[in-house]
Amino acid sequence: YSKATGTLLVNENSNINTLLDLKGKHLGIAGGVYDKTWLLFRAYSKSKYDIDLKDIVNPLFASAPILYKKMQDDSLQAAINFWHFNAKLESKNIKALIEISEILKELDIQKDVSFVGWTFDTKFANENKDLINAFLKASKESKEILKNSDEEWNRIKEQMSVKNDKEFEALKNGYKKGIIEEF
C-alpha cells in the first residue's frame, strides 16, 4: 500500500544533529519494541555506528497521538512517529533528523518496500479474487490520481481537517512520498 513510515524527528532547538547526539535522551517511539521502524533505526545505528540505538537512548513507547502532542509542547525532544503525524509536525518547528529513505540506503535496500499494507483471510481471498483484485486496482488508480492532481487534493482538503495550508501541503507531500512506484 505505502512506503510511508516513520521518520526520526527532533525539535529544531534541541542541538540533536546525529543519532549519537541522542545518547542518554528520551526517544519517543510509536508502537512497541517490535515496531518495524524502531527495528530499522536500530539496524541503521548498528550499521553506521556499530551501536544498537536501544543501548544509548531511553526509549519511550507510546501511542502516535501522545508522541505528537509531546513533540508539539516540547516535553519530548525526539520521536519516531507515523508518517501523517510526522508530516503535521514538520509543518511546525520540528525537523527530520533521519528519514527512512536514508536508512534503506545505508542498509543497501534499493527497491521500494511496502511498510503499510492490507491482509486478507486466505479463505476469503480465495473465494473473492475478483473483489480483491478490483479493490487493489481501485487503490492503485486512486494513488495515481492523488499523485498527479492538485485539483483532487483541493477537493478533499476540507475532509482532511487540516489547521492551515502548511499542514495541508505537508500531508499531501508526505502521502505522495509514500506511493510505491515499483513493487
Regions found by a protein language model. Give the residues of each.
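Pocket-lining segment of extracytoplasmic ligand-binding domains
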Residues: 65-156
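An extracytoplasmic/periplasmic, membrane-proximal ligand-sensing/linker region
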Residues: 90-91, 151-183
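Flexible glycine/proline-enriched surface loops and loop-helix/loop-strand junctions
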Residues: 23-26, 117, 175-180
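Sec/Tat-exported extracytoplasmic proteins
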Residues: 23-26, 31, 45-49, 89-93, ...
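Short, glycine-/small- and polar/acidic-enriched structural segments
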Residues: 1-53, 58-60, 77-83, 97
